[in-house]
Amino acid sequence: MAVQGSQRRLLGSLNSTPTAIPQLGLAANQTGARCLEVSIPDGLFLSLGLVSLVENVLVVATIAKNRNLHSPMYCFICCLALSDLLVSGSNVVDTLLLLLEAGALAARAAVLQQLDNVIDVITCSSMLSSLCFLGAIAVDRYISIFYALRYRSIVTLPRARRAVAAIWVASVLFSTLFIAYYDHTAVLLCLVVFFLAMLVLMAVLYVHMLARACQHAQGIARLHKRQRPVHKGFGLKGPVTLTILLGIFFLCWGPFFLHLTLIVLCPEHPTCGCIFKNFNLFLALIICNAIIDPLIYAFHSQELRRTLKEVLTCSW
């Protein structure tokens, strides 16, 4: 499956669709059917990447600055930010390489192709590690709620560091294999199963945490004989928070893995071909997730926000 010139080179070998038409509208696929195609300009990719890059650099710098944030939970959050940083950074570099290939450095296509292969490995490994750290954060929060008294003995900093190292090593290893054997159906299926496993893990853990929180709120309400007001107020906040958290995860990552699934199930079907045409949009959603992650997992912390102000004012 060759990489088309107008497609993102980020894992672009997965996209076997014809060259995209640069506008939002109805485009004809190989069978003449009409389908909606959303073109994402290079400038938009570059802008999204730069915003995410700056945002996640601030998260990493903030956690590194404050020793009070050197805990297992913030270790996972920092690594999530680092993964998103690499996704964004590789996107920025990839966009610049696309522009350079069309410009003065077109004669050095071989050098750019080698650099692009390295970027593909970095991008793929950072995407896998980002999913892993989202799962690790969910597990950490689950343990902190259901094993609160033993949390500090279960989730220690050395164990968190070993988990982080294992995630990075596994991500680099599997991403290298993925890039090398991208045309094997088993590889694509493994990626899809991995995404579904992370989705199920997060859904089960967060739903269980929500149920425990509801039970706790009801217990407090009965204790103070104010069951209805407390239950009503919490009943709105809890499900809404859970819906936003899981909804954003599925919205940003789901289309990309749907793309991989359809490559296996119906690579030649006209309807699937219409979905393939929006490959660039699916990648843009992943970059958007890298922008949203710090807002959900990092900036909700008052301590982190206070330290962020010090970082922005250069109070080191």
Curated annotation (Swiss-Prot):
GO cellular component, one term: cytoplasm
Stretches assigned to the Cytoplasmic side: 64-72, 140-162, 211-239, 300-316
Positions of glycan attachment: N29
Record InterPro entries: GPCR_Rhodpsn (IPR000276), GPCR_Rhodpsn_7TM (IPR017452), Melcrt_ACTH_rcpt (IPR001671), MSH_rcpt (IPR000761)
Main location: membrane
Keyword Zinc-finger appears in the UniProt entry: no
Keyword Glycoprotein applies: yes
Residue ranges that the UniProt entry lists as topological domain Extracellular: 1-37, 94-117, 183-190, 266-278
Cell compartments where the protein resides: Cell membrane
Function: Receptor for MSH (alpha, beta and gamma) and ACTH. The activity of this receptor is mediated by G proteins which activate adenylate cyclase. Mediates melanogenesis, the production of eumelanin (black/brown) and phaeomelanin (red/yellow), via regulation of cAMP signaling in melanocytes.
Subunit description: Interacts with MGRN1, but does not undergo MGRN1-mediated ubiquitination; this interaction competes with GNAS-binding and thus inhibits agonist-induced cAMP production. Interacts with OPN3; the interaction results in a decrease in MC1R-mediated cAMP signaling and ultimately a decrease in melanin production in melanocytes.
Name of the protein this chain belongs to: Melanocyte-stimulating hormone receptor
UniProt source species: Gorilla gorilla gorilla
